């Protein structure tokens, strides 16, 4: 079953502002939340709204989605996903705190598995490397589970203990006086930071965090045809997960150096070829550089400057495997700045012959001279 357009899911136009996107999400998330909605397919709609907001609320994800659709958002050319949290501290608890007064929403289990954070790595390629693809070994700083304590944070030979202040629940009850009477709210236990567990003896390597900072070498395959600004997702190569959760993803953002001769427009390559007046007037066969090697191009007699020739299949491969682009050669006449006396005489002779030309151009030229 094909996915619905994210703008359609939120009931917005493609030009919607961030504020409009946020308001639409809050309204629909409240409407379809399983704890509130009685609709039969509320869970599916809630997940659909969540997914749409996660993409459209992020500038980078939204740009990729607008350009590539769902393929860009979900198949390696999208933005940063998978963490479960939304930017700016806005999540499900915010919805319920605004509607139900602070503690009424479902609270996330602090000990539940959570996916690790995504990472971003910038790489710069030469023009040809982007065309043909490349395999890179990159070194990135990551937080991995501590080998000494196996990620527990506790000193080897010891274990975490149940927090005595919250009895392992990770939450404590707090009474609050309001105009409506006394209300009991549940909030995260400050002693165990909401985990329900405490470390009596911390691991000396990670100091109780369960993680250590290290540099990790990762092999990245750059696909042929990738363009400037596109990114590659390497699944599971981000930060380590929490409480046994999966690792985040690594996003490699590609920058491509400009080329002195070639320019790129999508899968097509554009270049300008300088030719002499004689070559364009009389016709010639010239060698044209391409990223695939030199090819011969026939220039017909009488070719005008600015004429464009197409070299089929000599462009960049489509990054998704949808065929091959072409190369377009734009010819430009080069006017010599230094001439010998003989060359000048020949040009004067040619100019004199042009005066006697009975072609339309010649007639027009004489008409403007009043002849």
Curated annotation (Swiss-Prot):
Keywords: Chaperone, Cytoplasm, DNA replication, Metal-binding, Repeat, Stress response, Zinc, Zinc-finger. Residues 5-69 form the J domain. Zn(2+) 1 binds at residues 146, 149, 203, 206. SMART domains: DnaJ. Pfam families: DnaJ, DnaJ_C, DnaJ_CXXCXGXG. This is Chaperone protein DnaJ. Homodimer. It comes from the Bacteria. The lineage of its organism: Bacteria, Bacillati, Bacillota, Bacilli, Bacillales. GO terms for cellular component: cytoplasm. A zinc finger (CR-type) spans 133-215. It comes from Bacillus cereus (strain 03BB102).
């Amino acid at each position: 079953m094909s996915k619905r357009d994210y703008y359609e899911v939120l009931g917005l136009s493609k030009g919607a502002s961030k504020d409009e996107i946020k308001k639409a999400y809050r309204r629909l998330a409240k409407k379809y939340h399983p704890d509130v909605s009685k609709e039969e397919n509320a869970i599916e709609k809630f997940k659909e709204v969540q997914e749409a907001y996660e993409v459209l609320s992020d500038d980078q994800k939204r740009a990729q989605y607008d350009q590539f659709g769902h393929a860009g958002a979900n198949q390696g050319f999208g933005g940063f996903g998978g963490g479960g949290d939304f930017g700016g501290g806005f999540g499900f608890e915010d919805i319920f705190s605004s509607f139900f007064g602070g503690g009424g929403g479902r609270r996330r289990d602090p000990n539940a598995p959570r996916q690790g954070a995504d990472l971003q790595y910038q790489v710069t390629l030469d023009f040809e490397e982007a065309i043909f693809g490349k395999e890179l070994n990159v070194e990135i700083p990551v937080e991995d589970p501590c080998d000494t304590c196996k990620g527990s944070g506790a000193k080897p030979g010891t274990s975490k203990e149940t927090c005595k202040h919250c009895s392992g629940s990770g939450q404590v009850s707090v009474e609050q006086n309001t105009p409506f009477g006394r209300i009991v709210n549940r909030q995260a236990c400050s002693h165990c930071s909401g985990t329900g567990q405490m470390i009596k003896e911390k691991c000396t390597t990670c100091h109780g965090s369960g993680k250590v900072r290290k540099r990790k070498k990762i092999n990245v395959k750059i696909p042929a045809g990738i363009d400037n600004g596109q990114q590659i997702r390497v699944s599971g190569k981000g930060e380590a997960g929490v409480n046994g959760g999966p690792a985040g993803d690594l996003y490699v953002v590609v920058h491509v150096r400009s080329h002195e001769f070639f320019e790129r427009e999508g899968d097509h390559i554009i270049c300008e070829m300088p030719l002499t007046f004689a070559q364009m007037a009389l016709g010639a066969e010239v060698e044209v550089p391409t990223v695939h090697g030199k090819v011969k191009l026939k220039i017909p007699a009488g070719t005008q400057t600015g004429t464009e020739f197409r070299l089929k299949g000599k462009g960049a491969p489509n990054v998704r495997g949808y065929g091959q682009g072409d190369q377009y050669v734009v010819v430009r006449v080069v006017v010599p700045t230094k001439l010998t006396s003989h060359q000048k005489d020949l040009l004067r002779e040619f100019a004199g012959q042009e005066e006697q030309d009975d072609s339309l151009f010649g007639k027009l030229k004489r008409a403007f001279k009043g002849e």
